[in-house]
Amino acid sequence: MNNEANEKPVLVIPCSGIGKVHGLISREATYLVTGELAPGRTETLCLALLVKGDAEAVAAVRDHACITIDGCPKACAEKNVEMAGGRAARAIQVAEAFKEHRGAKPGNATGLTDDGWAIAREVAAAVAGEASRLRGGEEVTR
Amino acid sequence: MSAETLKVGIISCSGEAIPEGTISRLATRRVLELLRPDATVTLCLPLFLAGNEAERNFAKTHPTITIDGCDKQCARWGTEKHSGPVSGALVVSDLLGTAATDCRRSSRGASQVDKEAIWAVAEQIAAEVDRVLADAAPPVGAGMGTSAAQCACSSPIPGGKLAVKGVTVSIPGLPLIFEQCVERSIPADAGGSAALLDVVKIYHCILPEEEAEYRSALLAAYQDFRRGKNQEK
C-alpha cells in the first residue's frame, strides 16, 4: 500500500446478509464506522454494485484499501471484493465477535437489541482501528 | 417451474450507500416475517457470486421478485445474470420518490418517516407477491417444500389467536401488528377499532360479514396487548 493509497478513505464493505442477525450487525457496524468512528477516513459502497460488476465500484475496490465484514463463513463480502480484483486487507467475521458474548440475545435480521448493538459497536471499533492502521501504512496480518 | 416453486423468492439489493437500500432490505424482511411468511423465501444477493450451484439456481427454482434501492437495479441485474429471469422487479426510488429524502441508512433511531417508507414498500412487495402467485397458478396442494438455497429467515413468525364467534382464529404476526398500531398511535378504544381492523385486514382475510365480530375481538386483544405493554414499563 503506497502513500497515495493511504490518503484515500478505507472502504468498509459489509455483507448485509438478509437472513440472520449477523448480516444486520455487519451493516450497522459499517454505519457506525463510516458515520461516527471514522467519518471521512472510511467510506462504504454497495456490495450489490460489485455483484453487478459496476465499473466505478470495481475501480474503487482496486484502488482503495478494503475491510470486509461478513456475517457468516460464506464470506460473500470478502469473496466479491476478491472477484472484483480487489483485496480485503482485513476480513472480519461477525461470528467471531459472538465468542465473547456467550448467551447474548442480539436480535434478528430486522432489528438489534442492546446486546446486538453492543456487538456491532465492538466490531465497528475493531474496523476503525484497522482502518487507522491501514491509513498509517501498517497493513494488518490476516 | 417445479411444484417446489410455489414460494416466491424475494431478492433485495444490499444498497449500503443509500437509504433506499436499507428500506429495500427492511421492507423485504417485513414481507418475509409478517405480510407473506408462508409464501416467500429469500437469498442474499451476493451469494449468487460467492455461493454454490444451488444458490445460483435460486431464480430457476422460484418465481423471483427483485427489490432494488435505485435505478441501477443491481439485484435485478445480478439475479438475471446468475440465476435466471425474474417475475417482477420493484425499485424503491421509483415507488417512494421524494418520500425517501429524509430517510436514514442506519436503522438506529429510525424516525416515523423511515418506518412509513418501509411499510409502504413492504405493502407493494406483498401485492407483487400476490400477483406473481396468481400468474403462476400452481396446482392446489402442490408441495410447499423448502429449497436448499433458502435462508433460515423465511420461517413464519408466531401468530396470535382471537376468539371470533366462538371459533379460535390464528393471525400470523398479530403481536407485531399490534406493535405497529401502537407506533401509529392507534387508540385502544372504539374510535381506533376501524383503523385496527384495516391494518389486520392487510395480513389476514376477513369477509365483510365477519368484520363486526373481528373488530370487537381485535379491540379486546389490542387492549390486552396495550395493558401488557404498560405493565412492562
Task: Show the residue positions of the predicted features.
Chain A
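Iron-sulfur-associated redox domains of electron-transfer enzymes in respiratory
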Residues: M1-R142
